[in-house]
């Protein structure tokens, strides 16, 4: 149903005020706060119409109104203007990728923390398992003294990296020689196909450099093991304590149990996601425990697999800010991963 401009303005004002205060909104207060250019009596009549249409509700103890879930849905679908992060916040987000480029897991943790800090809701990032079949290339690149960057390139363009420790006497030429021997053993093979005798031969040929060989092998094993498992990162679960809707301890415990259990969290996140940010409001959510909450989630492409990123908060959510932030972070993640590929 399409609302006329006056009803849209009143509904939008009520939603903004209710999100800010968590209190029912009265007609007289609206006229004082907003330049609606109509009387309080006219606002009351319009609010009554919006209530009859299902967009507003009137709590029993108050003369004011609050938005219904249908009202929030109309606002999100037909009226909302997204608010992406400002220049300062955008720069901080870019720094997450630049400062932690050697450790993707730290980037993901930083993203989850950034989302929860920016929105003041609980954030989550789901990193999909990476599927690949064989090695394409391995590089050992010198960094600071006693450190090297191990780059492991697999099929489908997957690149994994890890900082490893190396003896201080190892030169760039030594790293090139070690890289050559590793590639002889690894290229075109799966990890399980690399024979123990091949690795032993590398260690024997580089007897003075066994420490770097062992460190590199350990790093490779860790990278591959981590890539096989889907990861769920959650940040800001206790932000829910700041919301007046969740002062009931039993209700709070049920919600926190969902947020802390990876399997429960997966149940509430849509399996398939398109280009647009997906928003689930209140009773649209599948689990009973979070039917008084809203979910904002976006998918991102990670080496052919679908990752997910989003926030969970009260139905009384700043959707404009949550959607703008999630969308921006999603785009930056995809740009970063495209650069790696």
Curated annotation (Swiss-Prot):
SUPFAM superfamilies: GAF domain-like, Winged helix' DNA-binding domain. GO terms for biological process: negative regulation of DNA-templated transcription. Coiled coil: none annotated. InterPro entries: GAF-like_dom_sf, HrcA, HrcA_C, WH-like_DNA-bd_sf, WH_DNA-bd_sf, WHTH_transcript_rep_HrcA_IDD. Keywords: Repressor, Stress response, Transcription, Transcription regulation. GO terms for molecular function: DNA binding. The keyword Transcription regulation applies. It comes from the Bacteria. Belongs to the HrcA family. Negative regulator of class I heat shock genes (grpE-dnaK-dnaJ and groELS operons). Prevents heat-shock induction of these operons. This is Heat-inducible transcription repressor HrcA. It comes from Syntrophomonas wolfei subsp. wolfei (strain DSM 2245B / Goettingen). The gene is hrcA.
């Amino acid at each position: 149903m399409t609302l006329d401009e006056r009803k849209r303005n009143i509904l939008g004002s009520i939603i903004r005020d209710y999100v800010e205060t968590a209190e029912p909104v009265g007609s007289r207060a609206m006229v004082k706060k907003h330049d609606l250019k109509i009387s309080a009596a006219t606002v009351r009549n319009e609010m009554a119409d919006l209530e009859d249409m299902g967009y507003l509700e009137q709590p029993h103890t108050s003369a004011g109104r609050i938005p219904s879930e249908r009202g929030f849905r109309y606002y999100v679908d037909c009226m909302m203007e997204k608010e992406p992060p400002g220049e300062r916040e955008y720069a901080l987000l870019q720094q997450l990728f630049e400062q932690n480029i050697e450790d993707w897991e730290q980037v993901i943790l930083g993203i989850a923390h950034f989302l929860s800090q920016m929105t003041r809701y609980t954030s989550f990032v789901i990193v999909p398992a990476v599927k690949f079949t064989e090695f394409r290339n391995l590089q050992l690149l010198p960094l600071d003294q006693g450190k090297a960057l191990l780059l492991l390139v697999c099929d489908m363009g997957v690149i994994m990296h890890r900082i490893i420790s190396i003896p201080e006497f190892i030169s760039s030429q030594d790293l090139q020689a070690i890289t050559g021997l590793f590639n002889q053993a690894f290229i075109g093979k799966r990890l399980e196909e690399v024979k123990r005798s091949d690795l032993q031969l590398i260690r024997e040929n580089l007897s003075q450099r066994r420490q770097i060989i062992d460190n590199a092998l350990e790093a490779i094993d860790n990278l591959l093991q981590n890539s096989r498992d889907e990861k769920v990162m959650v940040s800001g679960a206790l932000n829910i304590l700041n919301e007046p809707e969740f002062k009931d301890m039993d209700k709070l415990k049920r919600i926190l149990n969902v947020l802390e259990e990876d399997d429960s969290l997966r149940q509430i996140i849509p399996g398939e996601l398109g280009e647009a940010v997906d928003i689930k409001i209140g009773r649209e959510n599948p689990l009973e425990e979070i039917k008084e909450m809203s979910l904002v989630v976006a998918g991102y492409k990670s080496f052919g697999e679908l990752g997910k990123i989003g926030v969970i908060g009260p139905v009384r959510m700043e959707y404009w800010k949550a959607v703008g932030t999630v969308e921006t972070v999603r785009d930056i993640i995809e740009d970063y991963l495209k650069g790696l590929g």
